[in-house]
C-alpha cells in the first residue's frame, strides 16, 4: 500500500479550506448557462467535486473571489473534459478551441455559445471589471494564461498518439496544460495592488510558477492513476509509463515520482528565496501583504491539490493504490475525531 504522505512540503504550506459557502451559487450559474442539467444527480456530484477545489486554492479570500475561483474550476473541467472525451474529430475540436480563444481574446460570444463559453465569458468580464483601466496589464496576463491553456489541450492529447513521452517532454507540455498559470494570474486579479509590474516577468517568478505547475501535475497524475489506467488513458500518466519505459514495479515508480516532486519543491524554495532578495524594499505593508498572498497561493496550489485529492469521489476508490484515498481510511479518520 502506498501513502501520499511520503510527499513532504514545508509546514507553512499547510492550509485550512475556505469555510465560505459558494458551491451552490456556482451551481446555479452552471444551470443558467446550460453546463449542468436540472436535478441531475451525476451533474451535481461532478459539480461539487470540481468546484470544491476553489476553497483549497484560495482559503483566505472573500465570497466574490471564491466564486470566481469556482467559475475557473467549472470552466476548466467542463471545457477540457469535452475535448478529452474523444467525441469530436480534429476539425470540430479545432473549431471549439478557436471559439473559446475568441471568448477570452475578443470578449465576444456567438449566438449559439456553449455552456463553457458562457462561463468563460462571465469570468472574463468579472476580471476586466475588477482590474479596471489601471491594471490592464494584470488583465492581459490572465487572458494570455487562459489562451495558452486553451491552445495546449489538443497538442497534449496528440502526444499519446506516439506512445508515452519521456518525462522531460511530458513535463514541458503539461506545465501549461495542467492549468496552474490561470490560477496564479487570477490571484493577481484578486489583489488591487500597486506592485512594480516588472515583478511578474522576473525569470525567478516565471521559474517558480513552472516548478509549482510541474509539482501540481505530478500530484494530479498520482491521484488520477487508477482512474486513467481503468479508462485506458495510462499512456500519459508517469506513474504508469515509468513502469512501462523503465520496467519499474508500482512502488519503485511511485518512489521515482516522489523524488521528482521533492526536486522541484527544493528548486522552487531556492528560487523563492532568490526572488524575495531581488525585490526592492516594500513601500508599505500592503505591498508586502500582496507579495505574500501570491506566494501563499503558489504553496496552496500544491498542498491544496493533495488535500482535495484525498477526499474527492472523482479519484477516491476502495481499490486505490494510495491508502489515503480509500474510503475506509477517511472513515477511520472521521471516527477518530469523534
Curated annotation (Swiss-Prot):
Motif (NDxxSxxxD/E motif): 220-228
Alphabetical UniProt keywords: Lyase, Metal-binding
Protein name: Terpene synthase 1
Species per Swiss-Prot/TrEMBL record: Cavenderia fasciculata (Slime mold)
One annotated GO molecular function: metal ion binding
Function of the protein: Terpene synthase that converts its substrate farnesyl diphosphate (FPP) into the sesquiterpene protoillud-7-ene.
Domain notes for this protein: Contains several highly conserved motifs that are important for catalytic activity including the aspartate-rich 'DDxx(x)D/E' motif and the 'NDxxSxxxD/E' motif, both of which are involved in complexing metal ions to coordinate the binding of the isoprenyl diphosphate substrate in the active site.
Keyword Metal-binding: yes
Pfam families associated with the record: Terpene_syn_C_2
EC number: 4.2.3.160
Group of enzyme by EC: lyase
Catalytic reactions on record: (2E,6E)-farnesyl diphosphate = (2S,3R,6S,9S)-(-)-protoillud-7-ene + diphosphate
Residue span of motif DDxx(x)D/E motif: 80-85
Annotated family: Belongs to the terpene synthase family.
GO biological process: terpene biosynthetic process
Amino acid at each position: 500500500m502506498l501513502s501520499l504522505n511520503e510527499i513532504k512540503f514545508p509546514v507553512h504550506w499547510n492550509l485550512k479550506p475556505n469555510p465560505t459557502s459558494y458551491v451552490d451559487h456556482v451551481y446555479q450559474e452552471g444551470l443558467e448557462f446550460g453546463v449542468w442539467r436540472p436535478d441531475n444527480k451525476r451533474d451535481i456530484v461532478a459539480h461539487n467535486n470540481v468546484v470544491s477545489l476553489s476553497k483549497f486554492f484560495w482559503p483566505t479570500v472573500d465570497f466574490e473571489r471564491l466564486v470566481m475561483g469556482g467559475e475557473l474550476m467549472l470552466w476548466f473541467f467542463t471545457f477540457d473534459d469535452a475535448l478529452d472525451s474523444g467525441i469530436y474529430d480534429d476539425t470540430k475540436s479545432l473549431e471549439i478551441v478557436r471559439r473559446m480563444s475568441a471568448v477570452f481574446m475578443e470578449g465576444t460570444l456567438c449566438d449559439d455559445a456553449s455552456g463553457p463559453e458562457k462561463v468563460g465569458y462571465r469570468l472574463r468580464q468579472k476580471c476586466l471589471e475588477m482590474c479596471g483601466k489601471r491594471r490592464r496589464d494584470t488583465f492581459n496576463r490572465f487572458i494570455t494564461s487562459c489562451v495558452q491553456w486553451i491552445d495546449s489541450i489538443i497538442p497534449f492529447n496528440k502526444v499519446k498518439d506516439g506512445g508515452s513521452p519521456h518525462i522531460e517532454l511530458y513535463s514541458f507540455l503539461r506545465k501549461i496544460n495542467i492549468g496552474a498559470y490561470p490560477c496564479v494570474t487570477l490571484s493577481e486579479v484578486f489583489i488591487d495592488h500597486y506592485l512594480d509590474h516588472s515583478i511578474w516577468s522576473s525569470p525567478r517568478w516565471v521559474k517558480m510558477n513552472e516548478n509549482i505547475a510541474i509539482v501540481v501535475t505530478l500530484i494530479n497524475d498520482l491521484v488520477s492513476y487508477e482512474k486513467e489506467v481503468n479508462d485506458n488513458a495510462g499512456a500519459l500518466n508517469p506513474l504508469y509509463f515509468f513502469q512501462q519505459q523503465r520496467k519499474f514495479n508500482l512502488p519503485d515508480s511511485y518512489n521515482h515520482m516522489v523524488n521528482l516532486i521533492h526536486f522541484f519543491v527544493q528548486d522552487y524554495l531556492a528560487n523563492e528565496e532568490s526572488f524575495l532578495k531581488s525585490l526592492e524594499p516594500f513601500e508599505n505593508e500592503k505591498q508586502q501583504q500582496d507579495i505574500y498572498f501570491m506566494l501563499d497561493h503558489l504553496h496552496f496550489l500544491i498542498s491544496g491539490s493533495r488535500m482535495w485529492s484525498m477526499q474527492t469521489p472523482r479519484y477516491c476508490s476502495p481499490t486505490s493504490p494510495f491508502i489515503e484515498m480509500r474510503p475506509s481510511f477517511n472513515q477511520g479518520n472521521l471516527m477518530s475525531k469523534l
